[in-house]
Amino acid sequence: MAFLKLYVIVLGCAKNEADFSLFKYHLKQLGHEVVDDVEDADGVVIDTCGFIVDAKQESIDTILEFASIKKQKPDFKVYVTGCLVQRYPKDLPLEIPEVDGWFGVIPPKNLAESINKTKKYITDPVAVYEFEGRVDSDLPYAYVKIADGCDRACTFCTIPKFKGGFVSRKLEDIEKEVRYLIENGKKEIVLVAQDTTGYGVDLYGKQMLPELLKRINDIDGNFWIRVMYMHPDHVTDEILKGFSYEKVVKYFDIPIQHSSDNILKLMGRTKSTKELEELFDKIRSLYPQAVLRTSIIVGFPGETKDDFEQLIDFIRTIEFDRLGGFVYSDEEDAASYNLPNKVSLKTAQKRLDTLMEVQAEISFLRNQRLVGKVIDVLFEEEVNGVIIGRSYMDAPEVDGNVFVKGHGINRFGKVKITEADTYDLEGELVE
């Protein structure tokens, strides 16, 4: 087998980033080289997203962009993997024959072993990996995938159809990976899965996220543990107790998708408006410093003006610290595709604009309360004498930043906040 210099592109979610940190390790173990510039590469590996229309289009555009390189460099290899391939295994090879290898959702080691082989298309059922090693960026945080697949039945979502059922990794293997990361200088461990609250149920017969948090918390070192993607229907009292450990940041990422009982029912969600409100009240009662993040879909089939107004009232009542908003994507193989009373794109976009305007007001006011306070910041980047970081209140890539004059990254520092806008903070080092 010829060894290749490969340029790697990761599209989509943090779970893909976690997978490809391991994939790059296995590529190197096999003798391939991962390069930072496509001009130096013999080929490209593209990890795709197949979740919604915009993500699919981005993936296809990226594939076509790199396939066009073959016009000038006929020997340039193009390998495509990930959720888009798993979702459309027959259509893609027919539509884009320039691609040298199509690989579905397979473990990182298997994927690395498949590169530069003669097989045109490979797909396996979803499988989790055992940790052997990983190659990460110089950033001080790392994503660790604790499970894959999903057993939920949200009507707008197609992920279970191409990712398979929920499969957890073993406690010991996750702990081994986290120890490796901490020993190699990481300051923040971000736990990800389709639904982190479901971790362990398939392996151990019960939710094991609290036990996992305890084990990671017991690892020596000064670092944060952040939990992402918690399904609101399964945030139990035991799960909430797991956040009491010292290194677990009090950051609760709980995508509710909507708050109207009518829309929640159509979405296949089980918690009611009242139960959601009680959940967030409980979290803030247990952890006064809690930061609440959620995701919202507007324009879902059947969403009336009253449903949307109820949603806005709910957002104003809860005052989420962080919120991501999206227009409903009408996926052809999702159950919601067959629902009546579709909302026009124009109306949905207008509702999204309104939602984000309301959230901007809330975010600004909540950030203003931080002015004059001293907070811990993890510094990640330095630009022209300004160091840029995040507090525990902000997750990587999706939330805001803290800007401070100074030097030195990949470290914690205490910062007194001097200015605050809607999403970002400015401050000065106090130690």
UniProtKB/Swiss-Prot annotation:
EC number(s) per entry: 2.8.4.4
Class in the EC hierarchy, top level: transferase
Source superkingdom: Bacteria
Listed Gene3D superfamilies: Methylthiotransferase, N-terminal domain (3.40.50.12160), Nucleic acid-binding proteins (2.40.50.140), tm_1862 like domain (3.80.30.20)
Binding site for [4Fe-4S] cluster 1: 13, 49, 83
Stretches assigned to the Radical SAM core domain: 136-365
Catalysed transformations (reactions): L-aspartate(89)-[ribosomal protein uS12]-hydrogen + (sulfur carrier)-SH + AH2 + 2 S-adenosyl-L-methionine = 3-methylsulfanyl-L-aspartate(89)-[ribosomal protein uS12]-hydrogen + (sulfur carrier)-H + 5'-deoxyadenosine + L-methionine + A + S-adenosyl-L-homocysteine + 2 H(+)
Protein name: Ribosomal protein uS12 methylthiotransferase RimO
Gene that encodes it: rimO
